[in-house]
């Protein structure tokens, strides 16, 4: 079983991969365009923050990815 930190890092890696695949090269541009605090979003991608389901759902909704899709691989 993975540690909490490993899970947070994996969430961050997947968020970054999705963001880049959707055409956002900069986390800053993505955050600003969608009204998310820049540093809050950076912490999510860096695995330095434990997102609430509400926050994760909001980010995934922007990317048109369901929670089920997000957690289907790598966890």
Predicted features along the sequence, with ranges:
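Key DNA-contact positions within bacterial/archaeal DNA-binding proteins
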Residues: 39-42, 49, 68
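The alpha-helix within a helix-turn-helix
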Residues: 19, 31, 60
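A short, Lys/Arg-rich alpha-helix, primarily the initiator
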Residues: 1-22
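Residue-level signal for the short linker/turn that defines the boundary of a DNA-recognition helix
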Residues: 13, 24-26, 51-54
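Residues within the helices of the helix-turn-helix
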Residues: 16, 28, 57
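DNA major-groove recognition helix of helix-turn-helix/homeodomain DNA-binding modules
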Residues: 52-69
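Short alpha-helical DNA-recognition segment
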Residues: 23-43
């Amino acid at each position: 079983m993975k540690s909490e930190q490993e899970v947070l890092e994996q969430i961050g890696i997947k968020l970054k991969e999705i963001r880049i695949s959707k055409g956002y090269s900069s986390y800053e541009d993505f955050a600003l365009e969608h009204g998310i605090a820049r540093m809050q979003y950076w912490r999510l991608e860096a695995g330095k923050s434990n997102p609430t389901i509400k926050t994760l759902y909001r980010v995934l909704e922007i990317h048109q990815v369901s929670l089920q899709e997000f957690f289907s691989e790598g966890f």
